């Protein structure tokens, strides 16, 4: 079973405008409300690709109920901790000539609720996969990723971490199965600008020496690189298409990677290219990637 963790799920209010004029009344040409959060995105894309998962996290108030209802309307399984106070955040995504985001803060997460999450993590078994994705809200301890990984150590659970450079560096000692920095984050981890494929792979190798098993490097319009624990490396150009929506593309890449890995019986090559295709399919669409969109892009990789 695949599990995802989203500490601070949201309702994403998505607005498209011809132009955003500050201080004026702006009228939208498109609007939608979707469940948001990196782990939820991974679960929804997995569902679109035909794979089940169970989403863990915290929700609160009427907005939390809406997050759960919307998420389950996609056929996904939620196993959230429901908080007694506060409300889940609303994030506003404005898409005009430039993308602008206004993200809410989210509810206070008390220690008792944190313990309840850890109780749910007890259900994970040998061979399961756990996706830890996104930032840590300021209402949680800043070492929560490390605590979760330490709690699950030695149980045969594949853990994927998709987070900022600081969080990634902290969890390497726990041997994450997969990490997914982009090329800029990878350079920032080592305090330098990495310009070539050789430099990127060399520093991905350094992350492996620090504990990571497999390193997936996204490079936006330049494609992606992948270094496996066996020392194999793969490269893919970015599929051709028009960028419509950057939100969720990285999460979709993780979901596609997992789907490809599961479907192929553990082929790194299939996992990598399906990850690239799925991330791009979401970027080229108003919504998250679907199976037909992914298959169409795969044929050209």
Where are these regions (language model features)?
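Hydrophobic anchor at the start of a short beta-strand
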Residues: 2, 52-53, 78-79, 159, ...
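Substrate-binding N-lobe of the ribokinase-like
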Residues: 27-87, 301
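Short beta-strand scaffold segments in enzyme catalytic cores
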Residues: 90-94, 224-227
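Short beta-strands and strand-loop turn motifs
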Residues: 101-103, 128-134, 162, 180-185
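Conserved phosphate-binding/catalytic region of the ribokinase-like
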Residues: 151, 197-301
């Amino acid at each position: 079973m695949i599990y995802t963790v989203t500490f601070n799920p949201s309702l994403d209010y998505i607005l498209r405008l011809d132009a955003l004029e500050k201080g004026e009344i702006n009228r939208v040409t498109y609007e939608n409300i979707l469940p948001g959060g990196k782990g939820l995105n991974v679960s929804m894309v997995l569902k679109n690709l035909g794979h089940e998962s169970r989403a863990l996290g915290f929700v609160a108030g009427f907005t939390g109920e809406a997050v759960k209802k919307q998420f389950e309307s996609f056929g996904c399984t939620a196993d959230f901790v429901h908080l007694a106070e506060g409300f889940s955040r609303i994030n506003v995504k404005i898409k005009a000539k430039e993308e602008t985001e206004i993200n809410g803060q989210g509810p206070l997460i008390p220690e008792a609720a944190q313990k309840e999450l850890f109780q749910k993590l007890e259900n994970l078994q040998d061979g399961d996969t756990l996706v830890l994705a996104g930032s840590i809200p300021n209402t949680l301890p800043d070492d929560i990723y490390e605590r979760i990984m330490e709690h699950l150590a030695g149980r045969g659970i594949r853990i994927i971490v998709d987070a900022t450079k600081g969080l990634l560096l902290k969890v390497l000692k726990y041997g994450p199965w997969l990490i997914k920095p982009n090329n800029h984050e990878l350079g920032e981890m080592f305090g330098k600008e990495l310009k070539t494929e050789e430099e990127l792979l060399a520093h991905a190798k350094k992350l492996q020496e620090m504990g990571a098993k497999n390193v997936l490097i996204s490079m936006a319009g330049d494609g992606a690189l992948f270094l496996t624990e066996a020392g194999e490396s793969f490269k893919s150009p970015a599929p051709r298409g028009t960028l419509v929506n950057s939100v969720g593309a990285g999460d979709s890449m993780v979901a596609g990677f997992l789907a490809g890995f599961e479907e192929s019986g553990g082929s790194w090559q299939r996992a990598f290219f399906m990850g690239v295709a799925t991330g791009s399919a979401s970027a080229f669409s108003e919504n998250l990637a679907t199976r037909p969109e992914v298959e169409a892009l795969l044929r050209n990789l």
